[in-house]
Amino acid sequence: DCSALVQLALAAGGIDAPRDSGPQHHIGSRIDDSSQLQRGDLVFWHGHVGIMQDGKTLLHANAHHMAVASEPLGDAIARIAIIAGPVTALRRPMPERVR
């Protein structure tokens, strides 16, 4: 699922992360503007999380595609908003233990 994908991706980068998207919501530092997003940043919705491939593309496991999908962030935001509401947080993980 989405949070396991993020947990595994962060682990590959040396960042220890919780298993669920709720606790993952507190990883790293807050990003105030989506124009600042870069590879490895996290995008959160209520009950969902994805990781940025680059400044404009989101990688996430989702029920819409029933797979891990790579899609433009704007498309993901618009589609997910219908089900889960707006983005709740943008975070930049830091290489430190977060548990």
Language-model features and meaning:
Residues 1-37:
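Catalytic cysteine-centered active-site loop
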Residues 21-24, 29-32, 53-99:
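Aromatic- and glycine-rich peptidoglycan recognition patches
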Residues 40-41:
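Structural motif
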Residues 44-45, 60:
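A generic structural signal for residues embedded in beta-strands
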Residues 49-50:
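A conserved glycine-rich beta-strand in the N-terminal activation segment of trypsin-fold
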